[in-house]
Amino acid sequence: MARVKRGTMVRKRHKKLLKQAKGYRGARSRHYKVAHEAVMHALADAYRDRRRRKRDFRRLWIMRINAAARLNGTTYSRLVNALKQANIQIDRKMLADLAVRDPQAFSRIVQQAQAAVTA
């Protein structure tokens, strides 16, 4: 049986990792050891931030809804409660988009929700 040396596989693995580090500054894009560490940190950050992005956008939507709700004489908390009682099923993303792009429609939704609470 022929002896198998691992040079080709090592070269392939190193090239693959250096390709991932392309665009990094200095040794991070040229030296395998430094590039490996940089890529591992980058992948860890990307994984974490894909989850964080969802939280960040939800917070942004809530802030926008709260600001628009206060212009209509209520708060975010009261508005969400009123929407639930009025059985108006609209998610925070759409509500925030309405608040920014179509304030009149947002105001009508707020009025409908408040009417359902008082009735």
Curated annotation (Swiss-Prot):
Organism domain of life: Bacteria
Tagged with keyword Ribosomal protein: yes
Alphabetical list of InterPro entries matching this protein: Ribosomal_bL20, RIBOSOMAL_L20_CS, Ribosomal_protein_bL20_C
Entry keywords, A to Z: Ribonucleoprotein, Ribosomal protein, RNA-binding, rRNA-binding
One example GO MF annotation: structural constituent of ribosome
One term under GO cellular component: ribonucleoprotein complex
Keyword DNA-binding: no
GO biological process, one term: translation
Protein family (similarity comment): Belongs to the bacterial ribosomal protein bL20 family.
HAMAP family: Ribosomal_bL20
Function: Binds directly to 23S ribosomal RNA and is necessary for the in vitro assembly process of the 50S ribosomal subunit. It is not involved in the protein synthesizing functions of that subunit.
Protein name: Large ribosomal subunit protein bL20
Gene designation per UniProt: rplT
